[in-house]
Design a protein with these regions (language model features):
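Conserved catalytic core of the tyrosine transesterase superfamily
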Residues: 1, 107-113, 146-158
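Acetyl-CoA-dependent GNAT
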Residues: 2-7, 11-86, 90-99, 103, ...
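A generic structural signal for short beta-strands and their flanking turns/coil linkers
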Residues: 70-75, 106, 126, 146
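Short amphipathic helical patch at the helix-1/turn junction of helix-turn-helix
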Residues: 79, 113-114
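Short glycine/proline-centered loop/turn elements that form peptide/ligand docking sites
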Residues: 93, 116-119, 136-141
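Alpha-helical structural signal in soluble globular domains
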Residues: 99, 122-126, 152
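Conserved catalytic-core motifs of GNAT/GCN5-like acyltransferases
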Residues: 109-111, 124, 129-149
Length: 158
């Protein structure tokens, strides 16, 4: 599935095995405690909704979504540092929301570092709300950092 954006030179498509080196490189450049190449490979093998944003013929961002039992979980979303603040993270998030709705998902969850104020602002803009806190969830230079748990309801309860 490809999604084209008329206002920017980018497409979103399903992640392929050949994309893993570029995805891993973006992850390493973006996080102090990155996912390994093997974790991304395992996400593909497990059949998670894994997608890449292509700009100028190169992977410029990626997102991974797990869907099961009427729920979805955003596992990872990241944009290459030089392409941030251009709306690509929002486009990846919109694609995940579209795919979740297409799978009849009721609720979509994610965890985010409270220190990641840019991501928190985007999630709130898209209708996510904080519902819980996971203590010491993330590795951090100063030990551990909590995670804010967010949810967005996609289908009203009947």
């Amino acid at each position: 599935m490809n999604v084209r954006f008329a206002d920017a030179p980018a497409t979103i498509r399903d992640m392929q095995h050949e994309d893993l080196a570029a995805v891993s490189d973006i992850e390493r450049r973006s996080y102090e405690f990155p996912w390994s190449h093997g974790v991304f490979r395992d996400c593909l093998l497990a059949g998670y909704q894994s997608m890449v944003l292509i700009r100028e013929g190169r992977v410029a961002g990626y997102a991974i979504l797990s869907v099961a039992a009427g729920e979805a979980h955003i596992l990872n979303v990241c944009v290459q540092p030089e392409f941030r603040s251009m709306g690509y993270g929002e486009r990846l998030l919109d694609e995940m929301l579209f795919r979740a709705r297409s799978a009849s998902v009721r609720d979509i969850f994610l965890e985010v570092r409270p220190s990641n104020t840019t991501a928190l602002a985007l999630y709130r803009k898209k209708g996510f709300r904080v519902v819980a806190n996971r203590p010491a969830y993330y590795q951090a230079n100063a030990g551990r950092e909590d995670a804010a748990v967010l949810v967005k309801k996609l289908v009203a309860d009947s």
